[in-house]
Amino acid sequence: MTPLRQFSMTPLAKKGANPTMPGSFGRRARPVVLAWALPLLLGFVFLGAAATSAQAQVGSITGKITDESGDPVPFANVFIKGTQLGGTANAEGKFTIIKIPVGTYTMTAKSVGHAPIDKTVQVNANQVSTVDFKISEQAVKMKAVDIKGDIKIAIRKKDSSTKQIVTSEDLRSLPVDNYKEAIGLKAGVISQGGELHFRGGRGDEVLTIVNGIASRNPLRAEGVDLGLLAVSSSEQVMGGLDAQYGNALSGVISLTTREGGDKFGGEIRYFTDRYGEADKSFNNFERLSTGFGGPFLFPKTNYFISFEGTYTDTYLRNTATHQEHRFLNFIRLGNRQSNSAKLSSKLTFKLTPNEKLNLEVIKNQDLIGEYQNRWNRAGFVQVRHDSTAPTDGNVSTRYGAWSYFQVDSTYVPVNTAEHLPVNTEDYLQTALTWKHTLGVGTIYNLRASRQQWNSSRDVLDRMPWEYQQQPNNYYDFTNRVDGAYYVTNGDYPFYERKKTVTWTLNGDFSKKVGSHNLMTGGDINYNDFGFLRTSYPNVVTGQGLYGADRDEFRAFNPEGSFFMQDRWEYEGMVLNAGVRYDEFSVGNQISSAEVRDRTKSQISPRIGIAYPISDRDVMSFHYGRLFQVPDRQYIYQGRLFSATSRGNPNLEPQTTISYQLGVQHLFSKDIYGQFGVYFKDIFGLLTTVEQEIPGFAITVPTYVNADYASSRGVEFTLIKRFSHGFSGEVNYTYGNATGTASDPNRALAAAGNLRDQFKPTSEQPLNWDQRQNISATLGLGNEKDWRASFVYQFGSGFPYTPHEREERRQNPDLINSKRLPSVSTLSMQGERFFRAWGQSLTLYVQGTNLLDGENISDLEPTNWPDGAINPQAYNIYYTETGRAGGAFLTQDQDGDGREDWFPVHDPRVFAQGRTIRVGLGVQF
């Protein structure tokens, strides 16, 4: 990647200067997203990188030891090779080993007078792997037999939290593009606009943890993404968070990445929709992914590397042109409208049977072009010259009439989509983990990491002073019945740079003492932020800075936490109790006159009870007080007078008080059910109010802790593991999520809109308040020949606020008072296994939204500049006619004395339609 040219955040000496300042943000290089991935991928094959699973990522092994006649072998010994984990079978030959870190192990069973036997077993997070041994009475040495233990469902008899599991096999077989889509199928989760809402909470209230390290950008609460082949398992803690989890109001997504085994192996996958004739399901989609690993160059060392590159023009394809590159002469890779590359590498050093050192590197890059319906015209525009308007003597160029063809010499080519911003996201994590097993039930973990997020939003990689804009934001008005309503303003006038660097050191220690399982730990974080956002970036303000409405800051802050928890087993009942202490400092960048307390702290108790009614039933209850520090941009932003809103260094942590009651029932060895009821009260949420800037007689909208919300609901999950040729899962949620606002900027938007000046005085449905949601999956096939997975989703309508044409003031009671139509999708993935040229091959066919349903996803997408066509015009059109897709008002066509609607058919209003992809996989 080429060096970045820097620009200053200090006043300019003169207009047009190109200042530099080390350490500032600068022009980013915009390479093909795949360009950096291939050299790194080859390099990591030889260098490696890795991290261990978090302490919370453990499972259990159970089984029975019998002799050749089927009789139990009492008191036989069973242990896991290379560790100090093991146990002794009871008088019936049954054994259980708990708290085993996720991974693949070799187990040995032996008894006096019997030959030892080995079996290989895969341990998954919070699941029980069953391994039965049949040992021979002949005293002979037997070879190891590689038999993977069958994963059977087991109820969590000691757990008072509600959890949902997504395995690596789920991610391979389901028709999903990422792990978040798989999580969105679970009970208690509502997926809307790319965000996951756990039990009615906001989308930024879910914490993502990767191998025991929190991976969420503290500036704006975005989590890390991983390729499908990089994930070993995903555990979602929906409720009942123990004290080890903090800074999350709604839930936790805990991801475990894959490790290399003792033998080299892996797979390559390629998916595309580029086949046959292009139709409306053709999105110019291609995905190339691989995951492979095995022993490394040194003894007791393993590695695993995964890469996933996804390139597509999406169903929101604009008219911009993109440079295309070929790979292997038939695979066409980036740059397209949406380009994504994810690289994960993991290196594991097993120093001794009880000590393991891990190094992990994760590198992601996304390059995504925007779609705006009114900035999506390729054709010709008439040029007009105006020499009277300018005061500097120069001739002003303005664009006027538009045409698909060149009418005469006054018409010049224009492609407005190429003047839209491109969003770039870069993420890099390096993590080092040390795991030490001191003895049976005694383990400690130490982790250190550095994470960096870089993001930008600009046009054609231009610096602020390079933007090109037309005077007075000139664009064609809607006086033409052919609907040629477009923007010829020049470059889309917004520019943004963000950077976050987070250093983390955390650890935990657990020990079993009698009937108590004790755990303690903590973490220390140091954050470094840089932020610049401006509109009209080529405008120079009176302070000599580029950009109107300029918002800029550089900030540093430390924070940390400490927790203690105990799992106490007493006469069949299990008490999970803990307490957590969190501390946060705003740093020293803000003057003392504005800060009441630079350091804030809170104590959050957690208590839960699990009561096994029988070996098939468990009841549980949990109470928790949860805190979350607001996104740091709401603390530090708006330090310049030109900013439209101002951060508040005196913000308090947002708070949730949650209760839940759960029941687990094991119907059979293959069928499991889970039922839960939850109640959540959330307060201290962010909104804006007008406040005076200290020392100045002006007021600015300032973020405060004033909003509140609540959610109630019931959840039901029924799982059937694969047996007798099929598997299935049903998840149902009935929930009610209400509050005073759905977004911290709701009041800010209302202040700038005469229609919405009145704020609600009571709780109303939140934007993601989908009262009923059901998902059902069905898996068919066999391991030898074929497999097919079907996914059906149904959700009741999301709320929306109706608007009327002559409305002057919005009645606050009408906010989210109406409901959109229900949504539903049917998707599938089919796989056919065969062998060719000595390799295992798989043919794939994947289809999403097979019924091609028109599901409304966003009734009011952003439009700039507003003019006569704006988000509320879309809303008014839907309110009056019941038709979605957007429209603007034009002259009276039917003679009734009122302006008539002209539809614009904005595809952003709807979710993606039917897509069909085919693929090929190679396993080795």
Annotate each predicted stretch with a short phrase:
Residues F330, V487-E496, V501, N517-D617, ...:
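Signature of Gram-negative outer-membrane beta-barrel scaffolds
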Residues G530-Y536, T541-G542, S585-G587, Y611, ...:
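Surface-exposed extracellular loop regions of Gram-negative outer-membrane beta-barrel proteins
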Residues A54-D150:
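Periplasm-facing N-terminal accessory domains of Gram-negative outer-membrane beta-barrel systems
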Residues D785-S789, Q793-E806, R832-F924:
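C-terminal beta-signal and adjacent terminal beta-strands/loops
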